[in-house]
């Protein structure tokens, strides 16, 4: 099923009331991106842990210089891993790519100024909570997955003009 991204101009500039469909799509995209980021983080953690282990094994001697260098390298990897993990957990940026857009000309007026640029939008915690609340109050016929907090994860069809088709591989 096609995935849908939200128009940044709608999120930033449009003050109309958000619909149920909007919140469902928002949370569905948010959760999928979150899972992908977490998986990438886990892979990066494993790779960097292997680097740390290799450093320790290759330099395992009593020379003070090498021992100090190993410690510095481990601190460097751990610090970067922690910062990367925090960034992925706290910041979810949606890429609104109009160069790869399959909207069939159905742009609303407020999105016209977005057509030539790749746009990014930060989704804050208050919007995520609103997504969760909206989904809890909506009757959902097909639930593909449930996350650890009991929130349904669904693919949402386009029923509102705030969604735009994107060919996402």
Swiss-Prot record:
Residues covered by region (Disordered): 33-65
Superkingdom as given in the UniProt entry: Eukaryota
Protein name (database record): Putative uncharacterized protein DDB_G0281311
């Amino acid at each position: 099923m096609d995935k849908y991204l939200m128009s940044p101009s709608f999120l930033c500039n449009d003050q109309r009331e958000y619909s149920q469909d909007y919140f469902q799509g928002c949370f569905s995209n948010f959760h999928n991106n979150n899972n992908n980021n977490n998986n990438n983080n886990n892979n990066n953690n494993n790779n960097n842990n292997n680097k740390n282990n290799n450093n320790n094994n290759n330099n395992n001697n009593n020379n003070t210089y090498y021992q100090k260098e190993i410690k510095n390298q481990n601190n460097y990897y751990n610090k970067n891993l922690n910062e990367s993990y925090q960034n992925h957990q706290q910041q979810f940026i949606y890429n609104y790519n109009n160069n790869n857009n399959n909207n069939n000309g159905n742009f609303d007026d407020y999105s016209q100024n977005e057509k030539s640029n790749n746009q990014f939008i930060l989704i804050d915690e208050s919007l995520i909570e609103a997504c969760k609340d909206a989904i809890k109050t909506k009757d959902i016929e097909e639930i593909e997955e449930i996350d650890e907090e009991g929130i349904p994860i669904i693919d949402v069809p386009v029923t509102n003009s705030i969604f735009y088709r994107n060919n996402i591989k």
